């Protein structure tokens, strides 16, 4: 759980912004959204596999564009 020490004479808005940023870095909101509803193990595997395929296709496309620029 992220915690923020409020410095002396620090405005509340600044401390809140730092807290939000630390929560975002820790991935708390994405974790809450992911756990909001139960996901069957097969659905989770399917989603992760689809994400991996998408990442791989994006990586291959990026490499293809890089090689096109060289020639």
Swiss-Prot record:
GO CC list: ribonucleoprotein complex; ribosome
Signal sequence, renumbered to the chain: none
InterPro entries documented for this protein: Ribosomal_bS21, Ribosomal_bS21_CS, Ribosomal_bS21_sf
Organism domain of life: Bacteria
GO molecular function list: structural constituent of ribosome
TM annotation in the entry: none
Alphabetical UniProt keywords: Ribonucleoprotein, Ribosomal protein
Any single Pfam family the record assigns to this protein: Ribosomal_S21
GO terms classed as biological process: translation
Family the UniProt entry places it in: Belongs to the bacterial ribosomal protein bS21 family.
Protein name, per record: Small ribosomal subunit protein bS21
Taxonomic path: Bacteria, Pseudomonadati, Pseudomonadota, Gammaproteobacteria, Oceanospirillales
Gene (UniProt): rpsU
